[in-house]
Structures are given as structure tokens and as C-alpha cells.
């Protein structure tokens, strides 16, 4: 039974509700179909047309799979200016046609990019086609392998590179780049024909982290030419010229700061720990640390600092300072024909060095060191 009072209450409540303002519902614009496709699309490219197709379609794919791609001669596998968040996956064997040119064979750039190698995948440079014993100093023009330029907050991992014609990774203009579990195998060039096959050349970059690298080559395992906040750890360097700062000088940016090499092995190489600066130039090297570094079968110098790297016939100059240079637990062996430690500094350019638990033996003791900092033995 409905009483008259109940009817009155219900009528009043309905009137109040109808009189109250009601907020418009929030309307979220529907994403465009093309944007959804870009976010979700996985594209696979293969064969002799794979490189060209990938370069043309790269901004339409959130994941780019490169499966047994055969890059034509004189052509870069161009993966520059990728969409943010793109994932690149190498599968199978990636090959490159022969031509005398400067390269690069591969180039990647962008923000929040991930580059990975699938199990068993490798990039085969087949460098013997170019090797002539002269590297980048003459003979055939040889392509550099992999440009990691202008990468931000990105990761390259699990990449296996075999027989690069000349320098392998060029890292330039990048920041917050992590490289993990990279293998560079240029052992086929150990017969003397391969040269200047640097593993990682770093310039004008910040916050670069390289972990777990295995580098078998014929030049610097790592060469930091300029940049700040660079960290290399858990690496194995074999057959090359060691873990190097420089050469510093001769560029628009000649500053190296806050570099750490940690928990790594250098074996069967010309040099172990190395800093090289250019005669007569200006710049600075500071806050460089080598910690827990093991040397074995070093042929030339266990530890070497040269401030006349480009012309050893001249006296070292002090335009490029080397300050706060730390060695902590650097130990190992040099061959009897080599030299344990060799330091050639400018008159006032090498300061605030701290060496602890340094034991490099087996080679000769140099009598030609110059301007060795206080408390450091040459």
C-alpha cells in the first residue's frame, strides 16, 4: 500500500534529482587505427630485399625481425630514426655484399630502442675480402661495421659479430646506452691481415655501460676518445691493444671523464692498460679507474701512458692533463721481450695518481720514463 506521504516524498526526490546539474561523461578519443597498427605490428624481413624493405618500413613496425638478411654491397642496413620503443631482432646469419667503401654496414638510432640477437644468430662481415694488413691506414677502403649513434636510453644485447672488415662498434652522440653480452670474433684475422679492428670506439657520449663483452680482435678492445660516465665490466679482451683511453686529441671534444674498467681480463694482447694523448693538443683526462684487471701474455706494455702518442720522437707535451688516474688490483704478466710499465708525461700534466696492488711482471723495466707522478713506480 502506498500512502500519500510516500508519494509526496518520492515526488520531491525526483524533482531534486532532475534539477541537479549532471556532469558530461568523459570522452577519450579513440586511437587512430594506424597508431594501433604501429604499436602492435611485428615485421619480418629476409633475403636480398630484406635490408631495403626494413629501411622503408621501419617506422611502421614495433618489432623488426631481420631473418637471414643479405645486405647488398655498398648499402647500409639503415635502422636510424626508429620509433620510440622499437625492438630489433637479428635471426640467423646476416651477410653483406663486397664493395670498397667506408660504411657503415649497420646503423641504428632512436630512443628506448632494444636490439637483440636470437639464439645462434650472427652478423658475418666476411672481413677477409677487405683485409690487406693496412686497416684504415691505406690499401682497400673498408667499411666500418656498426654505428650506434644518437641512441638514447637504449639496449644492445646478445649480438655476435664475426670478421669485421675494420672498426666494429662506433658509439657516438649516445646517452644511457647499455650493451650486454656482445661477442666480436675476428680471430680469422690474426694472421696479420686484419688491422684497426677496434671493438668499441666511444666518442661524445655519456652514461655508456658495456658488460660481459668478449672481444677477439687486432686493435683496441675499447677506446674512449671522448665522453663521460662510461663503465666497462666483466669483459675478455684478446689479441688486440688492450683497454684504452684515447687517443685523446685532434677532435672537437677532447674531454674524457669518469671512466671505469672493472673485473676484466686482457690476454695475448699488445698492451694491457693504456692511455694515449696527442702531442701538442689540449684537453683533459680525469677520474679514470682500472680495478681488478688481469693481464696475461702481453707482448709490448703491461701499463702504458704516452703523451706523445702520435709522434714518439718528440718530447711529451702537457696540454692534455691526466688527473685522478686510479689503478686498483691490476696484476699479470708481460712477455720477456715487452715492458712492464712505461710512462711518458708532460712536465706538469700528470697529477693525483693513485695505484694500489699493482703487480705487473715478466717484462723489462723501462729506463725511459719521463715525469712520473709522485709515489708511482715505472
Swiss-Prot record:
Location within or outside the cell: Secreted
Cystine pairings recorded for this chain: 43-61, 221-237, 345-350, 369-378
EC code: 3.2.1.15
Pfam families found in the cross-reference section: Glyco_hydro_28 (PF00295)
Native organism taxonomy: Eukaryota, Fungi, Dikarya, Ascomycota, Pezizomycotina
SMART domains: PbH1 (SM00710)
Keyword set includes Secreted: yes
PbH1 repeats: 103-125, 174-204, 205-226, 256-277, 285-307, 317-345
Keywords recorded for this protein, A-Z: Cell wall biogenesis/degradation, Disulfide bond, Glycoprotein, Glycosidase, Hydrolase, Repeat, Secreted, Signal, Zymogen
Family in the record: Belongs to the glycosyl hydrolase 28 family.
Biological processes, Gene Ontology terms: cell wall organization; pectin catabolic process
Active site: residue positions: 219 (proton donor), 241
Name this protein carries in UniProt: Probable endopolygalacturonase E
Propiece span(s): 20-38
